[in-house]
């Protein structure tokens, strides 16, 4: 069963893979995009009962892990940029209709980690964009725009992508999302859509019942002036 030791081990595996990719492509800058669900909070009572740590412990541990990961990445790259959106798993109430849209514990995890890392000279922390309440963010890499979106409000389908683009009022180069626990990729009218996996994978009661199972993974994209040049769905054990 997924626990803190497994999480540390998988982050170590991910760091080793990123180091190899950085050397292979001679990359100078890294964008760490936090796509939400950094903890498993209150949205699903069954998941909450299966959690090994309570929510407060999860916030503290996730913040420490993230801070250490950012520090390790800063040792590999000349410049590191950190941007975050919030996920549904960190809301404070099980009923999403009662939840305040921007009230997510992911914000505390990110604040904890980035506060510890703000002294690092080559690490830049992005502030949330006004008007989106932490549900969306937009970054620019080598002149191309990338929309960051957890995915609970926007479906990973052609219709979902079209609706999001209409809402934004512009066509981004790529949309990077998560939410479904498994990596995926598609293109919608030249917009690259990347769905990230998750560190824990599937296997708890909720993901089994809803057929959301997936092996633990994280996705690393190498971006050039043309957009996403290479994509690595990194499997973790």
What do the PLM-derived regions correspond to, one by one?
Residues 3-119:
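Core catalytic region of metal-dependent phosphoesterases/phosphodiesterases
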Residues 103-107, 115-122, 127-133, 142-236:
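Conserved beta-sheet core of the metallophosphoesterase superfamily
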């Amino acid at each position: 069963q997924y626990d803190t030791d497994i999480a540390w081990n998988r982050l170590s595996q991910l760091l080793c893979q990123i180091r190899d990719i950085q050397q292979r492509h001679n990359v100078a800058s890294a964008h760490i995009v936090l796509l939400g669900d950094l903890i498993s909070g209150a949205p699903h009572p069954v998941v909450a009962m299966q959690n090994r740590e309570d929510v407060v412990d999860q916030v503290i541990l996730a913040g420490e892990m993230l801070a250490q990961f950012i520090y390790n990445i800063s040792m590999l790259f000349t410049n590191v940029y950190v941007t975050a959106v919030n996920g549904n798993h960190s809301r404070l109430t099980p009923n999403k209709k009662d939840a305040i849209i921007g009230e997510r514990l992911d914000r505390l995890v990110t604040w904890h980690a980035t506060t510890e890392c703000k002294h690092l000279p080559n690490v830049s922390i992005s502030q949330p964009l006004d008007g989106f309440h932490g549900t969306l963010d937009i970054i620019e890499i080598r002149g191309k725009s990338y929309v960051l979106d957890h995915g609970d409000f926007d479906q990973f389908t052609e219709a979902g992508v079209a609706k999001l683009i209409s809402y934004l009022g512009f066509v981004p180069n790529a949309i990077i999302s998560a939410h479904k626990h498994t990596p995926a990729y598609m293109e919608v009218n030249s917009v690259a859509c990347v769905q990230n996996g998750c560190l824990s994978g599937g296997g708890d009661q909720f993901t089994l019942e809803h057929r959301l199972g997936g092996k633990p993974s994280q996705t690393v994209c190498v971006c050039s002036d043309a957009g996403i040049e290479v994509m690595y769905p990194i499997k973790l054990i």
